[in-house]
A protein has these predicted regions:
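Exposed beta-strand and adjacent loop surfaces of beta-rich binding modules
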Residues: 80, 101-105, 149
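N-terminal segment immediately downstream of the Sec signal-peptide cleavage site
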Residues: 28-72, 169-170
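Helix-rich interaction surfaces within compact, conserved domain-sized segments
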Residues: 114-170
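Extended low-complexity, serine/threonine- and proline-enriched intrinsically disordered segments
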Residues: 95-114
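N-terminal secretory signal peptides that target proteins for export/translocation
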Residues: 1-8
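A mature extracytoplasmic/lumenal domain signature
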Residues: 87-89, 110-112, 139
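Bacterial N-terminal signal peptides
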Residues: 11-22
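Short, surface-exposed binding/anchoring microloops in extracellular/periplasmic proteins
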Residues: 56-100
Length: 170
């Protein structure tokens, strides 16, 4: 009889631990979600036309066509950025399908602060041969909270022109 009571109590304790764990994960997920300032899912490559209509928030487009297969980025309220890009490659010309030996950095613009450039380290990260890259950095200066009408540009080091843009995620 005592053994069955002990087994029941252990079962209840295990169930309680699982419930508390689930609640804890839910709270943690909500806290992480509220720390995000802006998120981006998907990317648009630069299709230069030779006119100024490809200038975005004062930044000129690259001189050649660039394509990007995928982009995902999270910018936190403290300005930290985690960005994964896939397949950022030249989309035309003699070097089509190559990474152009480029290095890139990210810049976030917010309409409510006059489109100040909030950038990752301008020394950038080199594109892998297949155009993949990761930026794990802190934007400087830190963006405002909230950040209205956010625009995220992937830019080439040196010249600073843009190769790709992130698509804001709601």
């Amino acid at each position: 009889m005592k053994l069955s009571i002990i087994v029941k109590k252990i079962g209840m304790l295990i169930a309680l631990v699982f419930v508390m764990g689930a609640i804890g994960q839910s709270v943690l997920a909500q806290n992480l979600d509220t720390q995000n300032l802006v998120r981006f899912s998907g990317g648009i490559g630069d299709i230069s036309t030779g006119s100024t209509n490809t200038t975005v928030r004062g930044v000129a487009a690259a001189g050649q066509i660039w394509v990007i297969r995928d982009l995902a980025a999270d910018v936190s309220q403290n300005g930290s950025i985690r960005l994964d890009g896939r397949g950022l490659l030249l989309g035309a010309g003699d070097a089509v399908g190559s990474n152009g030996n480029a290095s890139v950095f990210a810049t976030l613009f917010c309409a409510n602060d006059g489109n100040v450039q909030h950038s990752s380290n301008p020394a950038g990260v080199a594109l892998d041969v297949n155009g993949d890259f990761r930026i794990d950095d802190t934007l400087s200066p830190a963006p405002p909270n909230p950040c209205t009408s956010p625009v995220l540009l992937i830019r080439v080091t040196g010249a600073g022109s843009w190769f790709a843009a992130g698509i804001p995620k709601n």
